[in-house]
Amino acid sequence: MNINKLAERLGLEPEDYMEVLELLVDSGKADITSLEQAIAAGSAEEVVAAAHSIKGASANLGLTELSEAAKDMELNAREQNLDGMSEKIQILKAKFEPVAALFQP
């Protein structure tokens, strides 16, 4: 992940991009928890909401792979299809982890 390139693409200074990215990480952690709970409860509506949140925030920051993983979950849940969501959330978490790792001590 090239922070300078992503920031430049959005017309931001790298420091400003990192501030916004940190907000995404904070909200993303909560959204992932919500996704896990929604999947366990079989709530397609809640999966849609949490996946949509991650999709939009990550797309706005140029994190295409993370956005696509969330989009896949959202589209399936919109069709009331929760099959394979356990695998899909693992893929999403794998895309999210490198971003979150930027803010770990």
Tell me the role of every PLM-derived stretch.
Residues 1-49, 53-105:
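Two-component system phosphorelay core
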